[in-house]
């Protein structure tokens, strides 16, 4: 595998993860800002991409974005192809939808709102690039199946091509792209010892709302039979 431009080698990553990065969540990969963008770094819009991490507390990408003091689009994308996979179900979507509604409530308390879009991730990012000239994409590394793995690689490729800075943070004990397991224990221990982050008190909203954003409470997906006795979503 050839690394994308600007990515750190696996070994260096492993060493950094073992020794700690001085941050709450261990940074997996980052594409640094492009030199020609440095003069434009005022008022740059950052996308915080929510996947299955539907919370505001202990959320390193959200905290990092809030500390920049610049506009943030808190984004969740309803990907219909994902919800047609054999290991997804209506009960999972119902839980996710309730969690999205609660996440929107939490973000409103920080002066922002959740932006829910529908479609494939690359198309949504292209739309946001045109409408809000997004310059950063922050997100948690997801441990899922082949579909989400391929989707994440496509996002990294798009960011590289469009010269959009991206950053991944780890949130679990799973460490991708290690050549061996020699440093896994150090990486896991370093992550588990990090303090829990509080929810950001203020999250600057974009200057204009995203056109076409959906009300999470009204979104439906065709993911199979319902389960009335499932666990409710949200943090309350």
Predicted regions and their residues:
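Hydrophobic, low-acid, alpha-helix-prone terminal segments
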Residues: 4-5, 10, 17, 21
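Short, Lys/Arg-enriched N-terminal segments with co-localized hydrophobic residues
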Residues: 33-43
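N-terminal beta-strand-loop-alpha-helix module at the start
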Residues: 43-112
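Short acidic, glycine/proline-enriched helix-loop-strand junctions
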Residues: 148-167
């Amino acid at each position: 595998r050839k690394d994308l431009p600007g990515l750190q080698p696996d070994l260096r990553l492993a060493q950094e993860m073992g020794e700690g990065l001085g941050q709450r969540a261990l940074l997996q990969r980052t594409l640094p800002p492009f030199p020609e963008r440095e003069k434009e770094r005022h008022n740059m819009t950052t996308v915080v991409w929510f996947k299955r991490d539907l919370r505001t507390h202990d959320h390193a990408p959200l905290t990092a974005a809030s500390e920049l003091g610049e506009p943030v689009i808190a984004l969740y994308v309803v990907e219909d192809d994902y919800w047609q996979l054999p290991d997804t179900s209506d009960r999972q979507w119902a839980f996710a939808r309730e969690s999205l509604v609660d996440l929107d409530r939490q973000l409103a308390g920080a002066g922002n709102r959740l932006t829910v879009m529908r479609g494939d991730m690359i198309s949504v990012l292209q739309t946001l690039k045109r409408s809000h000239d997004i310059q950063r994409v922050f997100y948690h590394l997801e441990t899922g199946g082949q579909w989400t793995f391929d989707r994440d690689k496509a996002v990294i490729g798009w960011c590289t091509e469009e010269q959009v800075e991206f950053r991944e943070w780890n949130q679990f004990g799973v460490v991708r792209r290690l050549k061996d397991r020699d440093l896994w224990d150090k990486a896991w221990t370093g992550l588990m010892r990090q303090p829990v982050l509080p929810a950001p008190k203020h999250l600057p909203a974009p200057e204009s709302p995203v056109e076409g954003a959906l009300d999470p409470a009204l979104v439906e997906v065709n993911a199979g039979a319902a389960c009335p006795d499932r666990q409710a979503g949200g943090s309350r």
